[in-house]
């Protein structure tokens, strides 16, 4: 399959590993999937290999896996694609999650491309505290994230991008739980060109695929970058 100058192909495999701890409960999750960098689509299968079953809603982790890899975003030609341009060396990100019920999470990830394997590796660490025992996350009353739009803000002097988005967890009772995401994306190599500010719309979808032995789920994402629709 033909590669771009960044070691990316039209279709790539992905391997994920997350180590985490939420309110004292430690866990390890691994996953594999297929992604289409230039179509902005990806799909992964995840499995809790240590610490399962999780005593909280796995939806809080979804944004660290799929929304966690911005290489799989469809970019128009008139916007510089910072994420693909960072490959094959890749990039890192650090993110804070502030939930409206008082819970706080932090996550960081390291993303690299193996040109030889045509594979993208995603290693992350996730920590969460202060989830109310009677809240929707600990009671597992969530049902995916509502589609969202992240504003991407360049910081040229530092060679980084900042991401700002309020996302909403859909609840099984019909309600919503708001979470503020603040992210810093940093390429491992010095960016040759920085993008202007822009938006990334993304939709995450989780499907439970657990069996008698392991907690498993399937995640898909579609992400598209754009400028303002207003002059």
Curated annotation (Swiss-Prot):
Q: Which Gene3D superfamilies match?
A: Green fluorescent protein (2.40.155.10)
Q: From which domain of life does this come?
A: Eukaryota
> Which keywords does this chain's UniProt record carry?
Chromophore, Luminescence, Photoprotein
Q: Does the keyword section mention Cell membrane?
A: no
Q: Where is this cross-link: 5-imidazolinone (Asn-Gly)?
A: 66-68
Is Translocase set as a keyword in this record? no
| Application of this enzyme or protein | Fluorescent proteins have become a useful and ubiquitous tool for making chimeric proteins, where they function as a fluorescent protein tag. Typically they tolerate N- and C-terminal fusion to a broad variety of proteins. They have been expressed in most known cell types and are used as a noninvasive fluorescent marker in living cells and organisms. They enable a wide range of applications where they have functioned as a cell lineage tracer, reporter of gene expression, or as a measure of protein-protein interactions.
In-chain residues carrying the UniProt-annotated modification 2,3-didehydrotyrosine: 67
Biological process according to GO: bioluminescence
What is known about the tissue distribution of this protein? Tentacle and oral disk.
Matching InterPro entries: GFP, GFP-related
Q: Name one Pfam family in it.
A: GFP
Give the free-text PTM comment from the record: Contains a chromophore consisting of modified amino acid residues. The chromophore is formed by autocatalytic backbone condensation between Xaa-N and Gly-(N+2), and oxidation of Tyr-(N+1) to didehydrotyrosine. Maturation of the chromophore requires nothing other than molecular oxygen. The precise stereochemistry of the tyrosine has not been determined.
Homology family: Belongs to the GFP family.
- Function per UniProt: Pigment protein that is yellow-green in color.
Q: State what protein this is by name.
A: GFP-like fluorescent chromoprotein FP506
Traced from the root, the source organism's taxonomic lineage reads: Eukaryota, Metazoa, Cnidaria, Anthozoa, Hexacorallia
